[in-house]
């Protein structure tokens, strides 16, 4: 079975890359009959590719400013690639790729099943309506499943799969009674939107007892988050 993961270029340093890489390696290690590849729609060649070291991938490049022409080039390039590779399943890691995959399938004349596998809330994503171009859907939370259904997708075509995690035997001990509780946040600093660091601050502000919050990360809302934390 050939499985292709498609999507717009990512940074190469995020959690989504880790999840996708783990899933691909799990698939391929579980059966020699499963072959996975990736296909990216790119505007430039800035994506860090260290995470793709053991993953076969291809890219379509287009920096055309007019969106409909840029999309047309990506669809054409992907359709040509589909003719050569003939995947059985295409899994779209973002919403716009559902549109690309659907149009490329028609253009290539190939038959395969399209799954959407969005890693972000649909309520905060541009082109969220494009998710309806997929045949079936993988939701990483019950909330995203509800967002899919709100866009007219049947619950029968949605599977809630959550995010894969590695099993650890290490247990983080509870804080000692005379020591403050220590919380750790690792990730992008988005005040609201996808990450909603504001909710973390609001929740901790209502917490009784001594505690500490350590934050590792950066983002466009760094100063906003910092200022809000001082107000509480």
What is the predicted function of each stretch?
Residues 4-6, 176-204, 214:
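Conserved donor-binding/catalytic core segment of Leloir-type glycosyltransferases
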Residues 6-14, 18-72, 81, 219-221:
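N-terminal strand-loop element at the rim of the active site
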Residues 15-25, 191-209, 220-223:
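A conserved mid-protein helix/loop that constitutes part of the nucleotide-sugar donor-binding site
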Residues 31-37, 201-232:
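A conserved nucleotide-sugar
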Residues 71, 92-98, 118:
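Short His-centered aromatic/hydrophobic patch
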Residues 79-80, 120-137, 151:
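Membrane-proximal helix-turn-helix segments that form the acceptor-binding/catalytic region
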Residues 90-91, 134-142, 159:
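A short beta-strand/loop micro-motif in the catalytic core of glycosyltransferases
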Residues 143, 164:
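Carbohydrate-associated surface elements
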């Amino acid at each position: 079975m050939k499985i292709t993961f498609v999507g717009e270029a990512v940074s190469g340093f995020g959690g989504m890359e880790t999840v996708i890489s783990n899933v691909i390696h799990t698939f391929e290690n579980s059966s020699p009959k499963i072959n996975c590849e990736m296909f990216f729609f790119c505007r430039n060649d800035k994506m860090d590719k260290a995470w793709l070291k053991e993953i076969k991938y291809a890219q379509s490049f287009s920096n055309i400013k007019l969106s409909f022409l840029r999309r047309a080039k990506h669809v054409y390039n992907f359709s040509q690639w589909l003719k050569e590779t003939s995947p059985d399943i295409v899994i779209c890691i973002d919403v716009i790729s559902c549109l690309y995959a659907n149009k490329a399938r028609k253009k290539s004349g190939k038959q395969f099943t399209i799954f959407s596998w969005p890693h972000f809330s649909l309520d905060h994503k541009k082109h969220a309506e494009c998710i309806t171009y997929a045949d079936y859907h993988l939701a990483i939370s019950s909330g995203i499943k509800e967002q899919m259904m709100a866009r007219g997708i049947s619950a029968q075509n949605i599977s809630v799969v959550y995010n894969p995690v590695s099993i650890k035997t290490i247990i983080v001990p509870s804080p000692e009674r005379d020591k403050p509780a220590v919380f750790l946040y690792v990730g992008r600093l988005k005040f609201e939107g996808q990450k909603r660091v504001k909710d973390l601050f609001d929740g901790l502000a209502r917490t009784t007892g001594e505690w500490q919050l350590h934050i590792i990360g950066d983002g466009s809302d760094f100063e906003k988050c910092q200022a809000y934390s001082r107000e509480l």
